[in-house]
Swiss-Prot record:
Subunit structure of this chain's protein: Monomer.
GO molecular function, one term: adenylate kinase activity
Function: Catalyzes the reversible transfer of the terminal phosphate group between ATP and AMP. Plays an important role in cellular energy homeostasis and in adenine nucleotide metabolism.
Listed name of the protein: Adenylate kinase
InterPro entries tied to this protein: Adenyl_kin_sub (IPR006259), Adenylat/UMP-CMP_kin (IPR000850), Adenylat_kinase_CS (IPR033690), Adenylate_kinase_lid-dom (IPR007862), P-loop_NTPase (IPR027417)
Binding site for Zn(2+): C130, C133, C150, C153
GO BP of this protein: AMP salvage; nucleoside diphosphate metabolic process; nucleoside monophosphate metabolic process
Chain spans, region LID: 126-163
Gene: adk
CDD domains with a match to the protein in the record: ADK
Domain description: Consists of three domains, a large central CORE domain and two small peripheral domains, NMPbind and LID, which undergo movements during catalysis. The LID domain closes over the site of phosphoryl transfer upon ATP binding. Assembling and dissambling the active center during each catalytic cycle provides an effective means to prevent ATP hydrolysis. Some bacteria have evolved a zinc-coordinating structure that stabilizes the LID domain.
Pathway: Purine metabolism; AMP biosynthesis via salvage pathway; AMP from ADP: step 1/1
Lineage: Bacteria, Bacillati, Bacillota, Bacilli, Bacillales
Length: 216
C-alpha cells in the first residue's frame, strides 16, 4: 500500500501515522527523516542537499525530488510506504507521479484528515507548559488539577508565544491556502480520501483501517 498522509497542524496526523505503520509494517517516510538519512548516507542527492542547507539556502525541488526517488527505491518500500510532508506543491505531486510510474507503482490513497479550523484553533491554542519541569497540558483535553499550576511540580504554567490565537490562526490560514491546490490535484486523480478527524483518535484510525485494509 502506497499512501500519502495530509492534514493541517493539530489534525492528529502524527498519531494516525504511528498506528498505520505499526499495524501494516510499512515505513513512515517524513521529509525531515528522508533528508537526514540521505545526508548521513552521503548519497548523491544527500550531498547536494547538504551543500544548500550548509549555506542556509532552500533546497531546490529537483534535489528534494531526487531524495524522494532514492528513498522510495529502497527495499523497505517494496510492500508500501506512508509519505508524510511530501509533496507540498502540485509541481512536487506531478514529479511524484513520474517517480511512481518509473518504479512501476502507483499511489493508492491520499488520506486527508479533516478537522474544522475552529476546532484546530482550540486544539492548538489550549496547550500550556510548565516553566519549571516542561510538563505539557491542554486546557480542554488534559487540564491540570488546579488552574495554571503544574500537577507534577507545582510550577507555573504558561502559553508559548507561537501558540497564541493570532499566530495560530495565521499559520492555519497559510496552510489552508497552500494545501488546497494539492487536494484539488489529488481529487482530480481520484486518490483523495477525506477522513473525519474530529472523532475519538481510535475511531479516526478505525475509519482509516476500513479504507486501507483491502490493500494489505
Amino acid at each position: 500500500m502506497n499512501l500519502i498522509l495530509m492534514g493541517l497542524p493539530g489534525a492528529g496526523k502524527g498519531t494516525q501515522a504511528e498506528q498505520i505503520v505499526a499495524k501494516y509494517n510499512i515505513p513512515h517516510i517524513s521529509t525531515g527523516d528522508m533528508f537526514r538519512a540521505a545526508m548521513k548516507a552521503e548519497t548523491e542527492m544527500g550531498l547536494q542537499a547538504k551543500s544548500f542547507i550548509d549555506k542556509g539556502a532552500l533546497v531546490p525541488d529537483e534535489v528534494t525530488i531526487g531524495i524522494v526517488r532514492e528513498r522510495l527505491s529502497q527495499d523497505d518500500c517494496v510492500r508500501g510506504f506512508l509519505l508524510d510532508g511530501f509533496p507540498r506543491t502540485v509541481a512536487q505531486a506531478s514529479a511524484l507521479e513520474e517517480i511512481m510510474k518509473d518504479l512501476g507503482k502507483k499511489i493508492d490513497y491520499v488520506l486527508n484528515i479533516n478537522v474544522d479550523s475552529g476546532l484546530l484553533l482550540k486544539r492548538l491554542t489550549g496547550r500550556r507548559i510548565c516553566k519549571e519541569c516542561g510538563a505539557t497540558y491542554h486546557l480542554e483535553f488534559n487540564p491540570p488539577a488546579k488552574a495554571d499550576v503544574c500537577d507534577k511540580c507545582g510550577g507555573e504554567l504558561y502559553q508559548r508565544s507561537d501558540d497564541n490565537e493570532e499566530t495560530v490562526a495565521n499559520r492555519l490560514d497559510v496552510n489552508i491556502k497552500q494545501t488546497k491546490p494539492l487536494l484539488d490535484f489529488y481529487e482530480e486523480l481520484g486518490y483523495l480520501q477525506s477522513i473525519n478527524g474530529e472523532q475519538d483518535i481510535n475511531k479516526v484510525f478505525a475509519d482509516i483501517d476500513v479504507l486501507i485494509g483491502g490493500l494489505a
